[in-house]
């Protein structure tokens, strides 16, 4: 019996070994078959050379309408979260009165939350709302508005009922530094004289430059001005240095994820998978041009200026462009100009049209307004 068992074990071992060999051989065959079916390196390069502009993108309005039809989820949980934030309103008000600025961050739109806080809790403040998510903001006008509010309050205190609106006009003609100096001199023990600057997205595209942030920081230092703001960009803290954070804004950070959709804020941002029209095309063109050499940018500017000056023409002849670029010492030969034009055409910055005389002419596929704005941004 033992002998039979030994033979059985040996047979099992042989069988197991042969199965392993077969499996390994099968794996090897599968590997080489897969390699044979892989596309060649040339095909890989061709596929990698595909551009986003080659895709058939859905119209932006259709895409936004579809997004609006998506039903909200976890409504009860979101409502409970919002209620927990509302319970902190008194603490927020206390910190605001103590001279701190409130900075709200976290996933989701905080627009409704902040406006609810302002309408229910800041009744003793004059609230000025700044929509930082807008593409452009007149920051000086915001500061002028604050100054006019204090001027009105001063006028009421002194009972100067005869004062006319024209007395407020000098603020608009003054520099921002002068207006901030005026604000710094406004002091009062009356809580009703406080102004709250409510900034939705202080990290918005129109407020991201250093100058705007410096002015906002200086305004936040004014005795009667308080700041409540929200941020959404992951790199928002990089907008401020240590002095701005701790001695000017004096931020008190609050993590308040609302998970609310960015319905209002998102209107001003183009959707990646949508054909966003002239505004998005202009932004894309600007990004591409900024990555090119100054000489290439100057060549593009020559073509753009010609197109703006001759809107009714079909385009600019290559010979005319070459002559103008030679006059400005931008190119030394047609080969150099051709290399620039090839780069423009690869990025869809320039199209070639057939002129009525049969010659090829160059055309930038942007409407005049977008082209003018592009040239302004490029300087």
UniProtKB/Swiss-Prot annotation:
Query: Which residues does the annotated region (Disordered) include?
Result: 1-25
Its GO CC terms are: nuclear origin of replication recognition complex
Q: Which GO terms describe its molecular function?
A: DNA replication origin binding
Q: Which UniProt keywords apply?
A: DNA replication, Nucleus
Pfam (any one): RecA-like_ORC2
Compartmental location: Nucleus
Per UniProt, the ranges with Low complexity bias are: 8-17
What tissues harbor this protein? Mostly expressed in roots, seedling and inflorescence meristem, and, to a lower extent, in mature leaves and shoot. Higher levels in inflorescence meristem than in shoot apical meristem (SAM).
Q: Which InterPro entries match?
A: ORC2 (IPR007220), RecA-like_ORC2 (IPR056772), WHD_ORC2 (IPR056773)
A biological process (GO) annotation for this entry?
DNA replication
What the protein does?
Essential protein. Component of the origin recognition complex (ORC) that binds origins of replication. DNA-binding is ATP-dependent, however specific DNA sequences that define origins of replication have not been identified so far. ORC is required to assemble the pre-replication complex necessary to initiate DNA replication.
**Assigned protein family:** Belongs to the ORC2 family.
PANTHER family from the entry? ORIGIN RECOGNITION COMPLEX SUBUNIT 2
Instruction: Write the protein's name.
Output: Origin of replication complex subunit 2
Give the organism, scientific name.
Oryza sativa subsp. japonica (Rice)
Q: What is the lineage of its organism?
A: Eukaryota, Viridiplantae, Streptophyta, Embryophyta, Tracheophyta
């Amino acid at each position: 019996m033992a002998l039979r068992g030994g033979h059985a074990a040996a047979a099992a071992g042989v069988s197991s070994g042969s199965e392993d060999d077969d499996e390994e051989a099968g794996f090897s065959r599968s590997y080489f078959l897969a390699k044979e079916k892989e596309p060649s390196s040339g095909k890989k390069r061709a596929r990698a050379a595909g551009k986003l502009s080659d895709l058939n993108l859905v119209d932006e309005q259709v895409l936004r309408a579809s997004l609006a039809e998506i039903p909200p989820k976890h409504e009860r949980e979101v409502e409970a979260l919002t209620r927990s934030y509302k319970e902190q309103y008194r603490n927020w008000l206390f910190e605001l009165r103590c001279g701190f600025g409130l900075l709200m961050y976290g996933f989701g739109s905080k627009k409704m939350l902040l406006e609810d806080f302002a309408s229910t809790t800041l009744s003793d403040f004059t609230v000025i709302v700044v929509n930082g998510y807008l593409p452009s903001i007149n920051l000086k006008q915001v500061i002028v508005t604050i100054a006019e509010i204090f001027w009105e309050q001063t006028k009421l205190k002194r009972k100067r009922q005869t004062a006319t609106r024209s007395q407020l006009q000098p603020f608009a003609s003054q520099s921002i530094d002068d207006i901030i100096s005026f604000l710094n001199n406004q002091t009062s023990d009356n809580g009703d004289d406080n102004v709250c600057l409510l900034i939705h997205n202080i990290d918005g595209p129109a407020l991201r430059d250093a100058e705007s942030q410096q002015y906002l920081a200086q305004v936040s230092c004014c005795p009667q001005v308080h700041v409540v703001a929200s941020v959404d960009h992951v790199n928002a803290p990089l907008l401020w240095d240590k002095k701005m954070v701790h001695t000017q804004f004096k931020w008190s950070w609050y993590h308040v994820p609302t998970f609310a959709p960015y319905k209002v804020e998102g209107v001003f941002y183009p959707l990646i998978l949508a054909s966003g029209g002239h505004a998005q095309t202009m932004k894309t063109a600007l990004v591409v041009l900024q990555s090119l050499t100054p000489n290439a940018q100057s060549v593009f500017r020559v073509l753009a200026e010609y197109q703006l000056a001759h809107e009714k023409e079909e385009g600019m002849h290559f010979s005319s462009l070459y002559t103008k670029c030679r006059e400005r010492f931008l190119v030394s030969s047609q080969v150099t100009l051709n290399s620039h034009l090839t780069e423009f055409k690869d990025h869809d910055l320039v199209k070639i049209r057939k002129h009525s005389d049969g010659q090829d002419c160059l055309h930038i596929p942007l409407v005049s307004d977008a082209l003018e704005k592009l040239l302004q941004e490029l300087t």
